């Protein structure tokens, strides 16, 4: 009511017209007008602001201050305005309203009573790298978690221990895979510790989880890196104690090198200075003990202070650290080992530990860094060590802090720091030692060893004058030595022994625990660090190792896994008087604490060498296996004589820089830290100075290494350079008398850091100098650790046991493998016998059987991966490798594929061997093959023995290898070769790259193996490469990264497809030879997968290979031209790689087969001696071992593939040629027109033609592959016909690049290079070629692709020409040379390669298929050369090849090959080798060789301007091709057992028609295909550099296709075209109508096109409800294995299962928002309860495959098949329970588990979390990753988007 001033303020009008008296109505109107017909509130209500309200200027007579319009005539008709002034007076005196008595704010109070809580998040205190101080151990790292564990579950699990700040589960960034690692940050340290204590090693969801305190997440990061690198899988990830042994050298090295070394150095130095409290602060013992306890408290402060070390001593680790720091450079040497060392030894850790250690302060020059902050005091204190300790003590807390701060401070100067660190490290040790000097207590052997490690007393270069300061007898005031009392305690022999033992025991216990926490067993560190070199058979050696070992044990655990060990080490190590003396000096001062430190340190270092690791036993080599690298440093140290007693022992432990004495002139070894603290500082200074110049130059690298590694490196280097370069002060020398300048330059803690950083040789001595030779007061000679013998004995026993266990396990594995193989063989035989009646057995089958018989049985030894490796030696089978090297028996069922109608030979359906089995078989067969290299299939089919290819592939390659091997193993042996070739080709792209990558490894292993016998070589290579790759493989085998899985699966899938496509005979023979083949095939397969441009195998093996090759029967070779070519290839491969561009001839090994195009069998025979060229035509095919390692650089890379293509000069047959993988007819030498037969210029070295195009993958069976199989029979004869697959290229390009199908845009591109156009349907070679006719000729082009089939069906049956019809493979007879087949024109394969018999009966000279197919002269078109043209995406890697284009659509990825008449092609130089072919014919228009090396690298360049003309030329070419194709197809159809309908041939278009089509774009626009061709042509022309200036000025701008199909152009939809057109043209207006089941089939989960012959091999198909044909067997296998592994601990599950029987959960199914039907809980379900069993029919794989097809045919789109294991599948499609309705979710509330109940495996669904009523039950299907993605509809926040 009453509106007071406030309102008036709002309403105050600027120009009141009246004072506020009522306005007359007229005024109102005026006001309205004035104010825009807006009643101004100011008019109605106002306030007198000391100025008249009215503008009239009337005198204000009123006394009111405000007014309000009570009645407004505008609102109330007929009234006058009534105002109220000041709430009391009204303008109308007798107005009936009462005045306002209470004045209040008219605004609505509710608006103000409401308030929003401003919740400003309080930033959490974040501990980053700049944090100074011990990082509170509130962060817990979980490892080995079940992949069903999600944040919510983890939070619930941890919150009971205390409040949680953060929970994070780590996923693989690439594929979002659960890594089994998680981080939980608690609010309090207590909660974190409780969580670790209660959760560590407990079973969660069936997994024994690893839980550890990880304050800075370093361990977690390390685990993460290892998992990401593929080194480990979540289940094999080494954690805790395992870590030390298990860390792979690479991952560890990477982790260590990540910066930790430098950081450690920094941290170590600084922390030592600032952070280390004088040992005096705490009794050294207590410090050490604290260290150990601290270590126990916190797994490790690997670079992060975990729990403040009370002593300020970081950990005994710190000592280790010091040792680590001590000689970063040495560590560099260690670096190798560091790989072996667990990352826990990271510098950071060590540094932290080190820094924390009070002793460090003594030791460090680095401390000086810390001191830098307080350098003066430290210096001051230094002379009086105790003060220094005080200083140090103060720092100790900072130690952690300092260590970080210092670290950060010193980070920039890392290299210097490093130096400093080196100094520091020695100093640290020295500090430790110094402590002992405080009291001369008898040095405990334990601690002494650590410091003593430097057997040779480092004699630092005389430090600058500052030395003198330290000159103060250290003994008198051991720097930080604990107070004399403490010292005395320590010094007292009993107390010290007790201390030593305690640390020893503790270390054994605590240390172990700590170590385990760190993730490495006690000895692990040492063992990890380095297996004890044999030189150091004794502990002392380990001590030396210790000294050297760059990485001390983890701060906490690694530091000194065994305190006693340190002493033992020290004792054994250097009980030399010098050592003893140093030890005693050091040890005494150190006393127990030092001992402990020493122990720790030594344990860090010792641990590295660790008593545990007997010098003789490198941690069972298994522990560290790969990880362990023998410490050269140790070896050096071992070799290094112990310094004379007078001299300080080489106290520098691994962590300590060698005293300058070793490298006085080299700063590198600053100086072994003397045991005397004083000396150590000097050493630390000296370290950098002493490090050899080269070492200094390499410091940055060293810095990257773990400290221990650095230390070892430096010490090794220093020692090796001058073991005792620096003079040792006379033992008698007075410490005071001995200036630091003498033995050790004085270190001024303060100055040291700076100096070190700046490279000053010696900072001012901040620490008292002690004569290293003079024992500190109270020094008592250290006594050997009484427990050393016991420890050694125990270790030895343990190692023996481990070895025995490993051997037993491995033998069992091998036996299982053999048993599996035997079973497979038996199965194959049974299947063959059973099917013999059903399907005619082709001759090939018999051959296969013969081959099988011929195949020598593999010996068990061949199966043993360590067959080559020394027992369980590092190389052979390391424990580190664990079982990784061993292939688990594969669970995959080998299914025989039903004979393809097209397959001409064996009808037997091959049961694809399980990938794993195949891999095993492959390995074995590889070995066998190597051993039996000479053995040839009696049948005369191409020798089964493919060059065994070492398993070099990376996980991807391996898997591919495995898969291809597996799948291919299915192929008959002879088929196998071609198939292998093809698969090799296929995989060669990928594999080539992988091989190239891995080659170095595998070659190294190969070379090693090559030395040994073939068998050994094969086994060793397989075992080694196996261990190389198998490490990745095995780890990756089932869990390999999803990429691998994908690739492998893809590969397998592809292979499966290939197998399907392969002729049935391949299958048949495969089945018969599957066992033999599986072995040989697997070999081959492995090899095949491995193929990458082979770098030559080690020459050593070459002789064997050659011998083997020669051993091959010539007759056989005759039968197997492909083999001959393979042999050639092998020979070539055997030959050392020729220099780039050098002709093969130049290679050391001459290929007998340089045959230009020999027509005669003799040449064939010659070739026969050679291995058949691998399909890739590159060494890839040949055994890696035999293959000389050819640097990839040697060959330009095929544009399509990264695989290098060997550039061979004319003299050599391009490797591609050697590999007749594509059987292209060579032009008969007699061919009159050489040009017509354009041999690919030899310059086109081997661009191996890809074995298969991506489309092949799409097709279950590549018809081409079938042909390949037949061709094998034929092609072996016609090896020349086969076109080598360019290892690097996805597909071979043929024809003018312009027209080459590779060119996407090329009118002649065959939609699917691979014969298989439609993914599902095997096609006859001719049919396979479908080209998108961009140009009228395109139709003709298709003819070019068909694979030549031999005239004789026998031949066809025997061998498909090639796995994939390569470029115009079939009628390519037209191609003058195999050039047609080779992606690049290459010298034609010697006719010898082509068995004349292979030629069709028409008997044209085998030289060319053209000839083989009689054709009218006009029919003989100008020979066409298939020039591989890199697609734009040519670079598309192997993956492209593997990409599954189910639809046979040409993907840009698919290279398309077009055949161009040779005439159209610019002449390419012909190889001299092919005299028949005029080199002219192959010359570019420019006259330049078609390919220069550069050009070779760029396939595209090969095609000259021809592109421009190619469009036109293509027509005639196409005509001839068509005709030829007609012939060929006719022949093929005649010979093929099941002739697929001939591809219709069309008359070539006239020029007018061609032009009409060309210019039709103006009428109808241009379609996508033409755009693609144009783009390809454009790109090719750009690459040709034919002086088309206009091209350079032309920029390709993408434009959408304009030809969307005209009304007239609308073609009738065929049924297969897809869903019918909507009558109304719009689906929305159509409503619903029934879709034909056939139409639906396309969209069913298996989007497999209906093929004339259904895919026989559905092995990988959607078993776990996986819809796709492409389901990879590999990933299936891995997922199976994961399930099986997880089902091992299922006792509790059984209990739950049994409980379920009594009380089933109430659940119902109803419509789900996720997809169709879903399962919902009708009652609350608690976490981890059994929800339901997945019930269905238990069926075998074969039945599952059949049913899957049937279900697809019936239109059942969903798959309810759930795989239980490799041979059992539960099919709930038609009978089952509600479980089948459970939908997938990326954030499921349940998980599936396989449990065994009464010997029956059951799939049970368990709840992961509490499930509420009406909540849908979901679990993660965990489909293997595939290319064809199934969209995920779960809608979860973290939805992956796809099921697979």
From Swiss-Prot:
Entry annotated with the keyword Hydrolase: no
Domain (SET): residue spans on this chain: 1705-1822
RxxxRR motif, short sequence motif: residues: 1678-1683
Compositional bias per record (Acidic residues), positions renumbered to this chain: 916-925, 953-962, 1008-1017, 1040-1064
Swiss-Prot/TrEMBL catalytic activity: L-lysyl(4)-[histone H3] + 3 S-adenosyl-L-methionine = N(6),N(6),N(6)-trimethyl-L-lysyl(4)-[histone H3] + 3 S-adenosyl-L-homocysteine + 3 H(+)
GO biological process: hematopoietic progenitor cell differentiation; methylation
Compartment annotation: Nucleus speckle; Chromosome
Compositional bias per record (Pro residues), positions renumbered to this chain: 383-399, 455-483, 1225-1243
Basic and acidic residues compositional bias, start-end: 27-37, 348-362, 487-517, 844-860, 926-935, 963-973, 982-1006, 1184-1200, 1253-1272
Domain Post-SET: 1828-1844
Region named Disordered: 18-58, 269-288, 295-562, 838-871, 890-1108, 1160-1341, 1367-1499, 1647-1678
Enzyme Commission number(s) from the entry: 2.1.1.354
The entry's keywords: Activator, Chromatin regulator, Chromosome, Methyltransferase, Nucleus, Phosphoprotein, RNA-binding, S-adenosyl-L-methionine, Transcription, Transcription regulation, Transferase
GO CC term (a single one): chromosome
Binding locations of S-adenosyl-L-methionine: 1821
Residues annotated as domain RRM: 128-216
Gene3D superfamilies hit by this protein: 3.30.70.330, SET domain (2.170.270.10)
Principal location listed in the UniProt entry: nucleus
Polar residues bias (residue ranges): 39-48, 273-288, 295-305, 313-336, 368-380, 400-411, 1277-1300, 1369-1381, 1659-1673
SMART domains: N-SET, PostSET, RRM, SET
Segments of skewed composition (Basic residues): 1437-1447
Assigned protein family: Belongs to the class V-like SAM-binding methyltransferase superfamily.
Role of this protein: Histone methyltransferase that specifically methylates 'Lys-4' of histone H3, when part of the SET1 histone methyltransferase (HMT) complex, but not if the neighboring 'Lys-9' residue is already methylated. H3 'Lys-4' methylation represents a specific tag for epigenetic transcriptional activation.
Subunit structure: Component of the SET1B/COMPASS complex.
Protein name, as recorded: Histone-lysine N-methyltransferase SETD1B-A
Organism (species): Danio rerio
């Amino acid at each position: 009511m009453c509106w007071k001033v406030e309102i008036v303020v709002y309403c105050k009008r600027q120009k009141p017209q009246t004072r506020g008296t009522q306005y007359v109505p007229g005024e109102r109107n005026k006001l309205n007008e004035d104010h825009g017909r807006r009643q101004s509130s100011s008019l109605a209500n106002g306030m007198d602001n000391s100025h008249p309200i009215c503008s009239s200027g009337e005198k204000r007579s009123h006394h009111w201050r405000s007014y309000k319009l009570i009645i407004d005539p505008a609102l109330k008709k007929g009234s006058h305005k009534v105002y109220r002034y000041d709430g009391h007076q009204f303008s109308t005196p007798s107005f009936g309203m009462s005045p306002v008595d209470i004045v209040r704010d008219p605004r609505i109070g509710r608006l103000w009573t409401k308030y929003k809580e401003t919740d400003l998040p309080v930033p959490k205190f974040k501990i980053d790298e700049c944090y100074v101080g011990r990082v509170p151990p509130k962060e817990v790292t979980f490892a080995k978690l079940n992949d069903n564990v999600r944040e919510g579950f983890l939070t619930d699990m941890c919150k009971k221990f205390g409040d949680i700040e953060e929970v994070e589960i780590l996923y693989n960034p690439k594929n979002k895979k659960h890594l089994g690692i998680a981080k939980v940050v608690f609010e309090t340290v207590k909660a974190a510790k409780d969580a670790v204590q209660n959760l560590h090693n407990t079973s969660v969801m069936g997994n024994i989880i690893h839980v550890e305190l990880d304050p800075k997440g370093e361990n977690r990061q390390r685990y993460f890196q290892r998992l990401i690198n593929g080194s480990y899988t979540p289940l094999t990830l080494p954690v805790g104690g395992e870590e030390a042994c298990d860390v792979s050298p690479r991952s560890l090295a990477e982790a260590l090198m990540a910066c930790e070394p430098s950081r450690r150095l920094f941290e170590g130095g600084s922390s030592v200075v600032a952070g280390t409290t004088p040992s005096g602060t705490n009794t050294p013992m207590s410090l050490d003990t604290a260290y150990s306890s601290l270590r126990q408290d916190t797994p490790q402060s690997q670079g992060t202070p975990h729990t403040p070390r009370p002593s300020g001593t970081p950990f005994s680790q710190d000592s280790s650290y010091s040792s680590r720091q001590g000689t970063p450079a040495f560590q560099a040497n260690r670096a190798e080992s560091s790989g072996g060392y667990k990352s826990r030894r990271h510098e950071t850790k060590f540094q932290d530990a080190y820094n924390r250690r009070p002793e460090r302060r003594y030791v460090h020059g680095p401390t000086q860094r810390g001191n830098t902050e307080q350098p003066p005091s430290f210096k001051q204190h230094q002379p009086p060590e105790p003060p220094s300790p005080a200083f140090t003590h103060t720092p100790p807390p900072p130690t952690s802090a300092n260590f970080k701060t210092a670290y950060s401070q010193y980070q920039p100067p890392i290299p210097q720091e490093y130096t400093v660190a080196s100094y520091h490290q020695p100093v640290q040790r020295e500090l430790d030692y110094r402590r002992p000097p405080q009291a001369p207590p008898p040095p405990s052997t334990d601690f002494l060893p650590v410091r003593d490690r430097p057997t040779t007393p480092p004699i630092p270069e005389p430090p600058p004058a500052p030395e003198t300061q330290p000159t103060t007898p250290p003994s008198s005031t051991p720097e930080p030595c604990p107070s004399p009392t403490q010292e005395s305690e320590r010094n007292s022999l009993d107390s010290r022994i007790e201390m030593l033992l305690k640390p020893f025991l503790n270390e054994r216990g605590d240390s172990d625990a700590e170590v385990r926490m760190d993730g490495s067993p006690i000895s692990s560190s040492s063992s990890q660090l380095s297996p004890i070199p044999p030189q150091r058979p004794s502990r002392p050696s380990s001590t030396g190792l210790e000294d050297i070992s760059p990485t001390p044990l983890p701060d906490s655990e690694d530091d000194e896994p065994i305190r006693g060990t340190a002493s033992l080490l020290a004792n054994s190590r250097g009980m030399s008087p010098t050592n003893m003396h140093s030890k005693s000096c050091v040890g005494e001062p150190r006393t127990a604490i030092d001992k402990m430190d020493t122990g720790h340190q030594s344990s860090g270092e010792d641990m590295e060498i660790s008593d545990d690791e007997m010098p003789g036993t490198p941690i069972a080599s298994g522990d560290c296996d790969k990880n362990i690298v023998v410490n050269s440093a140790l070896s050096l140290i071992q070799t290094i004589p112990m310094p004379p007693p007078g001299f300080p022992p080489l106290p520098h432990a691994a962590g300590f820089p060698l005293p300058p004495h070793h490298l006085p002139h080299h700063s590198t070894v600053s100086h072994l830290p003397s045991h005397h603290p004083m000396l150590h500082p000097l050493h630390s200074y000296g370290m950098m100075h002493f490090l050899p110049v080269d070492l200094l130059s390499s410091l940055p690298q060293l810095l990257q290494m773990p400290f221990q590694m650095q230390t070892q490196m430096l010490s090794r280097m220093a020692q090796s350079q001058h073991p005792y370069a620096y003079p040792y002060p006379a033992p008698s020398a007075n410490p005071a008398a001995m200036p630091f300048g003498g033995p050790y330059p004085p270190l001024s803690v303060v100055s040291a850091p700076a100096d070190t950083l700046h490279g000053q040789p010696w900072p001012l001595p901040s620490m008292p100098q002690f004569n290293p030779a003079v024992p500190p007061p109270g020094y008592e000679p250290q006594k050997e650790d009484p427990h050393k013998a016991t420890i050694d004995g125990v270790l030895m026993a343990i190692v023996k046991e481990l070895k025995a266990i490993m051997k037993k396990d491995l033998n069992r594995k091998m036996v299982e493998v053999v048993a599996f193989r035997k079973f497979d063989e038996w199965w194959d035989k049974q299947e063959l016998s059973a099917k013999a009646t059903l399907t005619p057995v082709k001759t090939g089958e018999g051959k296969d059987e013969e081959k099988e018989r011929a195949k020598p049985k593999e010996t068990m030894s061949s199966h043993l991966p360590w067959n080559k490796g020394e027992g369980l030696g590092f190389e052979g089978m390391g424990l580190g490798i664990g079982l990784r090297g061993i292939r688990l028996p594969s669970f995959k069922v080998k299914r025989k594929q039903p004979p393809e109608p097209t397959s001409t030979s064996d009808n037997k359906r091959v049961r694809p061997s399980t990938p794993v089995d195949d891999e095993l078989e492959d390995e074995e067969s590889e070995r066998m093959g190597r051993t039996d290299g000479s053995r040839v299939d009696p049948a005369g089919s191409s020798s089964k023995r493919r060059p065994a290819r070492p398993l070099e592939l990376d996980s991807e390659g391996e898997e591919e290898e495995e898969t291809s091997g597996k799948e291919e193993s299915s192929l008959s042996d002879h088929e196998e070769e071609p198939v292998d070739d093809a698969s090799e080709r296929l995989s060669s792209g990928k594999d080539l790259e992988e091989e190239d990558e891995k080659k170095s490894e595998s070659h190294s292993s190969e070379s090693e193996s090559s030395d040994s016998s073939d068998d050994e070589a094969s086994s060793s290579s397989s075992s080694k490469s196996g261990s190389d790759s198998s490490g990745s493989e095995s780890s990756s085998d089932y869990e390999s990264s999803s990429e691998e899985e994908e690739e492998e699966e893809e590969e397998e899938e592809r292979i499966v497809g290939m197998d399907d496509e392969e002729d049935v005979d391949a299958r048949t023979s495969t089945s018969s030879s599957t066992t033999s083949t599986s072995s040989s095939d697997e070999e081959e397969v492995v090899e095949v997968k491995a193929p990458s441009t082979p770098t030559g195998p080690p020459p050593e093996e070459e002789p064997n290979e050659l011998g083997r090759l020669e051993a091959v029967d010539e007759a056989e070779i005759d039968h197997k031209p492909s083999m001959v070519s393979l042999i050639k290839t092998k020979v070539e491969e055997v030959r050392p790689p020729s220099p780039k561009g050098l002709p093969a001839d130049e290679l050391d090994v001459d290929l007998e087969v340089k045959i230009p195009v020999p027509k005669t069998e003799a040449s064939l025979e010659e070739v026969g001696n050679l291995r058949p060229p691998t399909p890739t035509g590159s060494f890839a095919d040949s055994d890696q071992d035999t293959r000389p390692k050819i640097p990839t650089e040697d060959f330009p890379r095929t544009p399509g593939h990264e695989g290098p293509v060997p550039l061979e000069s004319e003299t050599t047959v391009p490797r591609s040629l050697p590999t007749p993988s594509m059987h292209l007819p060579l032009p008969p030498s007699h061919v009159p027109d050489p040009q017509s037969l354009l041999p690919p210029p030899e310059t086109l070295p081997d661009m191996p033609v890809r074995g298969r195009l991506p489309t092949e993958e799409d097709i279950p069976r590549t018809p081409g592959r079938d042909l390949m199989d037949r061709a094998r029979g034929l092609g072996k004869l016609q090896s020349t016909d086969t076109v080598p697959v360019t290892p690097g290229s996805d597909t071979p390009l043929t024809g003018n690049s312009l027209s080459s199908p590779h060119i996407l845009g090329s009118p002649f591109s065959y939609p699917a290079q691979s014969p298989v156009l439609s993914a599902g349907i095997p096609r006859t070679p001719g049919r396979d070629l479908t080209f998108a006719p961009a140009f009228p000729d395109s139709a003709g082009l298709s003819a070019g692709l068909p694979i030549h089939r031999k005239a004789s069906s026998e031949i066809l049956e025997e061998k498909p020409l090639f796995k994939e019809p390569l470029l115009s493979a079939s009628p390519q007879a037209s191609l003058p040379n195999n050039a047609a087949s080779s992606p690049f024109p290459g010298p034609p394969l010697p006719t010898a390669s082509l068995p004349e018999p292979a030629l069709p009966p028409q008997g044209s000279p085998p030289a060319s298929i053209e000839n083989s197919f009689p054709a009218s002269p006009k029919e003989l078109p100008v020979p066409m050369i298939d020039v591989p043209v890199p697609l734009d995406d040519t670079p598309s890697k192997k993956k492209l090849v593997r990409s599954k284009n189910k639809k046979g659509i040409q993907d840009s990825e698919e290279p398309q090959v077009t055949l161009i008449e040779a005439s159209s092609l610019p002449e390419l130089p012909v190889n001299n080798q092919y005299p028949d072919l005029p080199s002219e014919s192959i010359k570019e228009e420019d006259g330049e060789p078609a390919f220069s090396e550069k050009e070779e690298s760029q396939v595209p360049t090969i095609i000259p301007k021809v592109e421009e003309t190619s469009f036109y030329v293509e027509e005639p070419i196409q005509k001839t091709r068509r005709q030829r194709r007609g012939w060929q197809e006719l022949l093929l159809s005649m010979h093929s057992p099941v002739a697929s309908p001939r591809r219709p041939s069309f008359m070539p278009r006239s020029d007018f028609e061609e032009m009409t089509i060309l210019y039709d774009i103006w009428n109808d626009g241009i379609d996508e295909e033409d755009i693609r061709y144009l783009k390809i042509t454009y790109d090719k022309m750009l690459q040709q550099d034919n002086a088309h200036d206009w091209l350079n000025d032309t920029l390709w701008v993408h434009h959408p296709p304009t030809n969307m199909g005209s009304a007239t152009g609308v073609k009738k939809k065929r049924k297969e075209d897809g869903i019918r057109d909507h009558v109304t043209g719009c689906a929305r207006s159509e409503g619903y109508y029934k879709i034909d089941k056939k139409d639906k089939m396309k969209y069913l989960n298996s989007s497999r096109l209906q093929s004339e012959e259904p895919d026989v091999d559905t092995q990988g198909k959607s078993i776990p409800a996986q819809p796709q044909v492409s389901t990879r067997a590999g990933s299936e296998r891995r997922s199976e294995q994961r399930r099986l592994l997880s089902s091992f601990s299922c006792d509790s599950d059984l209990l739950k299962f049994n409980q379920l029987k009594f009380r089933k959960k109430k659940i119902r199914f109803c419509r789900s928002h996720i997809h169709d039907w879903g399962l919902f809980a009708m009652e609350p379900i608690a976490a981890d309860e059994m929800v339901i069993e997945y019930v269905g029919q238990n069926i075998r794989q074969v039945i599952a495959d059949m049913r899957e097809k049937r279900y697809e045919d019936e239109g059942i789109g969903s798959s309810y098949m759930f795989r239980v294991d490799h041979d059992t599948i539960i099919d709930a499609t038609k009978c089952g329970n509600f479980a089948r309705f459970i939908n997938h979710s990326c954030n499921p509330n349940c998980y599936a588990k396989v449990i065994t109940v009464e010997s029956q495996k059951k799939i049970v669904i368990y709840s992961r979390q509490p499930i509420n009523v009406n909540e849908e039950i979901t679990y993660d299907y965990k489909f293997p990753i595939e290319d064809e993605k199934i969209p995920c509809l779960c809608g979860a926040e973290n939805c992956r988007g796809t099921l697979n």
